[in-house]
């Protein structure tokens, strides 16, 4: 994989020197090999090592090169046609899902996204570079953006959106860690991290500029929901006191033992 990384990095530095028609065979093969590694889960855009998430920038480079070098193609969906550069993940009988993966009709998964065993997709959308770990449910009309990392046993409720982050290369993708619940119509975007075991209420919107207020500590932070947080939508007064600004409110933090004994509705109502 080291050789592949070197080829991709060098190609990205010289990306203006070739087009779809003139891309060297060596680079073309390296791009496709990288996409295959992402597709089967052998490579991830981001990985947690020693408690820290690290981004594989070269894998992002490969995706951007994939967009640049692939020609537009016609995809026959039976009842209509689509025109795109990136094929879908399950395009024929030889590309079968992992054990226990359920893909309900009208769910769409792009090539280069990985679905671990025992994941369930209701009609939803998973973009290239995304990683969805085992036991996770992606509910109806939920979307998982490019390069987003979704942990084990996560529930993305109906209409929830997890934003994609391809550029800048050094930016972390949006990350939802293990055992999280993301409420209906909530949006977690711009590389925000929701740590393990957190519960996000319905209709919570969190980007990098969204204030995250911890009711217990009275701290305001940005870009990260701490482990075990129970979060609801709210607002904070502006500095001049003339208006209120939308905020995400951490009403409490619970451990795994409490989470296992108390229903999600109870946790949110107690807030």
UniProtKB/Swiss-Prot annotation:
TM regions (residue ranges): none
Recorded GO MF terms: 2,3,4,5-tetrahydropyridine-2,6-dicarboxylate N-succinyltransferase activity
Disulfide bonds: none
Pathways per UniProt: Amino-acid biosynthesis; L-lysine biosynthesis via DAP pathway; LL-2,6-diaminopimelate from (S)-tetrahydrodipicolinate (succinylase route): step 1/3
A Gene Ontology cellular-component term: cytoplasm
Location in the cell: Cytoplasm
Record's catalysed reaction(s): (S)-2,3,4,5-tetrahydrodipicolinate + succinyl-CoA + H2O = (S)-2-succinylamino-6-oxoheptanedioate + CoA
Record keyword Manganese present: no
Similarity field: Belongs to the transferase hexapeptide repeat family.
NCBIfam families xref list: dapD, PRK11830.1
Oligomeric form and interacting partners: Homotrimer.
Protein name, entry field: 2,3,4,5-tetrahydropyridine-2,6-dicarboxylate N-succinyltransferase
């Amino acid at each position: 994989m080291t050789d592949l990384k070197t080829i991709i990095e060098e190609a990205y530095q010289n990306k203006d020197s070739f087009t779809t028609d003139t891309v060297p065979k060596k680079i073309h093969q390296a791009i496709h090999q990288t996409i295959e590694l992402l597709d089967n889960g052998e490579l991830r855009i981001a990985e947690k090592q020693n408690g820290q998430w690290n981004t594989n920038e070269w894998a992002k480079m490969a995706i951007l090169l994939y967009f640049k070098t692939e020609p537009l193609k016609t995809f026959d969906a039976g009842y209509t046609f689509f025109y795109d550069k990136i094929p879908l993940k399950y395009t024929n009988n030889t590309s079968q899902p992992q054990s226990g993966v359920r893909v309900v009709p009208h769910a769409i998964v792009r090539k280069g996204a990985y679905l671990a065993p025992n994941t369930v997709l209701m009609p939803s959308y998973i973009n290239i570079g995304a990683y969805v770990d085992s036991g996770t449910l992606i509910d109806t009309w939920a979307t998982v953006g490019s390069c987003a990392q979704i942990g084990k046993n996560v529930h993305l409720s109906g209409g929830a959106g997890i934003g994609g982050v391809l550029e800048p290369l050094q930016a972390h993708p949006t990350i939802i860690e293990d055992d999280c619940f993301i409420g209906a119509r909530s949006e977690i975007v711009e590389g925000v991290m929701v740590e393990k075991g957190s519960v996000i209420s319905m209709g919570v919107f969190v980007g990098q500029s969204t204030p995250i207020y911890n009711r217990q500590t009275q701290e305001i932070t940005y870009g990260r929901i701490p482990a075990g947080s129970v979060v609801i939508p709210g607002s904070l007064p502006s500095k001049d006191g003339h208006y209120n600004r939308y905020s995400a409110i951490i009403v409490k933090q619970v451990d795994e033992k409490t989470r296992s004994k108390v229903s999600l509705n109870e946790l949110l109502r107690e807030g």
